[in-house]
Amino acid sequence: MAATDLERFSNAEAEPRSLSLGGHVGFDSLPDQLVSKSVTQGFSFNILCVGETGIGKSTLMNTLFNTTFETEEASHHEACVRLRPQTYDLQESNVQLKLTIVDAVGFGDQINKDESYRPIVDYIDAQFENYLQEELKIRRSLFDYHDTRIHVCLYFITPTGHSLKSLDLVTMKKLDSKVNIIPIIAKADTISKSELHKFKIKIMGELVSNGVQIYQFPTDDEAVAEINAVMNAHLPFAVVGSTEEVKVGNKLVRARQYPWGVVQVENENHCDFVKLREMLIRVNMEDLREQTHSRHYELYRRCKLEEMGFQDSDGDSQPFSLQETYEAKRKEFLSELQRKEEEMRQMFVNKVKETELELKEKERELHEKFEHLKRVHQEEKRKVEEKRRELEEETNAFNRRKAAVEALQSQALHATSQQPLRKDKDKKKASGWSSIYSVTIP
């Protein structure tokens, strides 16, 4: 009996019963309540404009919303790509719209364009992170939170008439998983209709072959399925922007005046501006907001929560509570910390051993060098002693010879001084004898 009741309760949870009402209750006014609440709260819509400097991003925004936004003139000498968001409060009838236009200033102006997409990706992720942090707060206030997540990226393509640039393909590939991309051909009045048609086909072919996922207007809603299906075939839109009014016939229209004629912005035979405005604002603005939240933000949120250790439970297993997730992550961090500490300790021990070996090797080298220098010193000392002895012997011999020479010199001087005295004596003796002889012999 208990098993039967359990099965009955399980089936009741899986398949709720449909009941008929006996009279009017009043919850059929829920759509009206939702509309009233939404109108009171207002809406936010955030557009990211990516394209080369001077391609007409600001002009197109002014044309789309039929107003003049205050923007700074951008130069072609930006050192890097920077994102410049500007927020405006718009009102049409009783609907308030907080519009944020984010311009990728300096995109494509650098010589090295390898990392031109990086600031754009970082900005989109930063807005997702801000929203996630608001969601994770204990006291959160999403009702008053200004949602800055990018709802659509209008990617402006230079009208070369040939093919997409490598920078365009790389950037759109990096962005397609983070934002709804609508490619548009800017300044479409600079190429002929035949060239424009071929250019569109070429662009779509390159996007498909390179796996770039652009935003497709939804066809699951019967109310807009037909028009969206038709508009999907016109992508990318070839647009012309202008805030100047030119008189055509008896009325003033927004157009661009050329010597050869007038290009009317809202003439669908001249460009796709009206198609872009209808698809972007009138028909699919809410779907762009919904896709941003349910697809792109959810992907970012899921990756972040998985990094934090959260995961969905399997169908057969019990769901994980926040405490269990916290404890599991805490144990994981502690084990990782212990592993890191052990690695650092082992690294320190190995480093100490290596240092000790190096010190011992240095000590051995210094000892060998000392012994070598000691031997060299002793050898030099021995040689110096030998030289000293030889010098002393030579000095003694020199002194002896000097003494002998001095003795001989003194003897010679003595002998030289005695010889004149003998000569004088001899002379005197001779003269004496001669006088004697002279006396005896007359």
Curated annotation (Swiss-Prot):
GO cellular component terms attached to this protein's record: axon; cytoskeleton; presynapse; synaptic vesicle membrane
Short name of one Pfam family: Septin
Record keywords, A-Z: Acetylation, Cell projection, Coiled coil, Cytoplasm, Cytoplasmic vesicle, Cytoskeleton, GTP-binding, Membrane, Nucleotide-binding, Phosphoprotein, Synapse
Region annotation G4 motif: where it falls in the sequence: 186-189
Region (Disordered): 377-442
Main location: cytoplasm
Chain residue ranges for the region called G1 motif: 51-58
Binding site for GTP: 51-58, 106, 187-195, 241, 256
Positions of region (G3 motif): 103-106
Coiled coil: 322-410
Record carries keyword rRNA-binding: no
Post-translational modification N-acetylalanine, affected residues: 2
Top-rank lineage group of the source organism: Eukaryota
InterPro entries assigned to the protein according to its UniProt record, in alphabetical order: G_SEPTIN_dom, P-loop_NTPase, Septin
Positions of modified residues (Phosphoserine): 10
Residue stretches making up the Septin-type G domain: 41-307
Keyword Acetylation found: yes
Biological process, per Gene Ontology: regulation of intracellular protein transport; regulation of protein stability; regulation of SNARE complex assembly
Segments of skewed composition (Basic and acidic residues): 377-391
Compositionally skewed regions (Polar residues) per UniProt: 408-420, 432-442
Biological function: Filament-forming cytoskeletal GTPase. May play a role in platelet secretion. Seems to participate in the process of SNARE complex formation in synaptic vesicles.
Protein name: Septin-8
